[in-house]
Amino acid sequence: MATNQSISIFSSASLAVEYVDSLLPENPLQEPFKNAWNYMLNNYTKFQIATWGSLIVHEALYFFFCLPGFLFQFIPYMKKYKIQKDKPETWENQWKCFKVLLFNHFCIQFPLICGTYYFTEYFSIPYDWETMPRWYIALARCFGCAVIEDTWHYFLHRLLHHKRIYKYIHKIHHEFQAPFGMEAEYAHPLETLILGTGFFIGIMLLCDHVILLWAWVTVRLIETIDVHSGYDIPLNPLHLIPFYAGSRHHDFHHMNFIGNYASTFTWWDRIFGTDAQYNAYNEKRKKAEKKTE
């Protein structure tokens, strides 16, 4: 009975979204995007698209999303939004981070990316324009991937903080007590594989078009770079997402090496009480801010 009701609610919601979508004006960028997509399909093999296309998407978007946070350090106005004001970014740390990123991206992640083509072939995932999902379907599936990844990340991240293994793997990610955007993927190669598995579980369960793979890469990069940015920007649109953790939530984890283990949402930390110290810190911070007003 409950299952039937859930299906009925889901179907009604889907119909409502489809109706709203039908009322929206035609996207002027759709035709150019369609032409570009078909040009890609006609001029490159599936292996080239899945391998080199995925690499380009990841590298271009990663450093593009890191750019605002990188520029903030040169803008005096943005300093008031920096969470750990007493720990500014240094060129030494950023250069060290960049070198490790290049190693991780091309020696660890790229070999995994090379398997994308075989993944899409094995699961018969299409590339063509005609089967590309509508925007709301892609958004819903990306949200599903985020929930799956967040769950995996919470429990495995918490395990990596166990005193018997922390110093061997996860300690590298905590070298910088005040995080910055580029540090999001600064990690031990084993951590890249362990926590990165959560990214692929969602893809294996929910991906039905290669564009969804790239969409999920985009969403995940936006999220992880944002929470590592070190800045709490008031008008950040990501704060509109229910239960979104955000930069201040994750910054506390880097500041104190404990609690707030989830990557995207707050519910697992809330359920298991691993946000208790953060909540106490946050209340104290808010009271201090009120006194200074």
Curated annotation (Swiss-Prot):
Keywords: Cholesterol biosynthesis, Cholesterol metabolism, Endoplasmic reticulum, Iron, Lipid biosynthesis, Lipid metabolism, Membrane, NAD, Oxidoreductase, Steroid biosynthesis, Steroid metabolism, Sterol biosynthesis, Sterol metabolism, Transmembrane, Transmembrane helix, Ubl conjugation. A motif (Histidine box-3) lies at residues 249-255. The chain crosses the membrane at residues 55-75, 100-120, 199-219. It catalyses: 4,4-dimethyl-5alpha-cholest-7-en-3beta-ol + 6 Fe(II)-[cytochrome b5] + 3 O2 + 5 H(+) = 4alpha-carboxy-4beta-methyl-5alpha-cholest-7-ene-3beta-ol + 6 Fe(III)-[cytochrome b5] + 4 H2O; 4,4-dimethyl-5alpha-cholesta-8,24-dien-3beta-ol + 6 Fe(II)-[cytochrome b5] + 3 O2 + 5 H(+) = 4beta-methylzymosterol-4alpha-carboxylate + 6 Fe(III)-[cytochrome b5] + 4 H2O; 4alpha-methylzymosterol + 6 Fe(II)-[cytochrome b5] + 3 O2 + 5 H(+) = 4alpha-carboxyzymosterol + 6 Fe(III)-[cytochrome b5] + 4 H2O; 4alpha-methyl-5alpha-cholest-7-en-3beta-ol + 6 Fe(II)-[cytochrome b5] + 3 O2 + 5 H(+) = 4alpha-carboxy-5alpha-cholest-7-en-3beta-ol + 6 Fe(III)-[cytochrome b5] + 4 H2O. Its main location: endoplasmic reticulum. The histidine box domains may contain the active site and/or be involved in metal ion binding. Catalyzes the three-step monooxygenation required for the demethylation of 4,4-dimethyl and 4alpha-methylsterols, which can be subsequently metabolized to cholesterol. This is Methylsterol monooxygenase 1. It comes from Sus scrofa (Pig).
